[in-house]
Amino acid sequence: MAAVARGAASAGGEVIGVVPGSDPGEANPDCTHVVATGIGHARNLAVVASGEVVVAIGGEWGTLSEIGHARSIGRTVVALRSWTLGGRDRMEGAPGVIQAETAEEAVAAALAEL
């Protein structure tokens, strides 16, 4: 997330950080606006519900939970070298999941879903 925030900020974009704790200071310094939720991992649902398309980049357990939340509320997920759920071939063709190999592919796929 830090690299995404840095890239967006360096391009002049506004960066909204949604942090799990109640301290806005835990946000990345590149965040323009911070939402300190104080709700721990439950903030993952707030993050995915706030957008129209979810782009999952790489990821650990939190990313996997965000993918699950996104699909459970009907959000399309663009997976950029992200979770494969048992192998890339099993994720390919999964309803509501679009695979991307590059950032450009991910952005194009996300914009096409809007």
Identify what each model region corresponds to.
Residues 1-75, 83-89:
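Acidic/glycine-enriched connector segments
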